[in-house]
Amino acid sequence: LTHQPLPPNPEVWQVILSDHRLDSGDPWLRVKTSHRPVYERARVALPAGVDEAILLNEGGEVCEGTITSLFLRRGGRLLTPPLSCGLLPGVLRRSLLEAGRAEEARLMPDDLRDGEILMGNALRGLIPARLL
């Protein structure tokens, strides 16, 4: 077991759409586990200068990042994909939904160009992101 300080977040994360797909029917996607082969493959494939990859499911719907939940601020609303798309019910995601600060909505890749992308987790909070 090792530890080290968490480096500060870049002001804006650079993100890409991953070629790796999630299976929305996979029950393991909804459990925090160290068995994360799809996420690990997508993370290893990140080009230099890219902070995160956005994963889609088999239907092309937006799901989440490799280590983050995804949010889209559009029209005064903070949207996040529903669990039925195949994603982890993260702590930050759940707290924003329960507080009424976010709502679930099915998102497609084209939707990401019509709002402000935010990636986040309980450790780092919400981080503005730019889709490359």
Language-model-detected regions and their locations in the chain:
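Helix-start/capping segments and mature chain N-termini
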Residues: 1-132
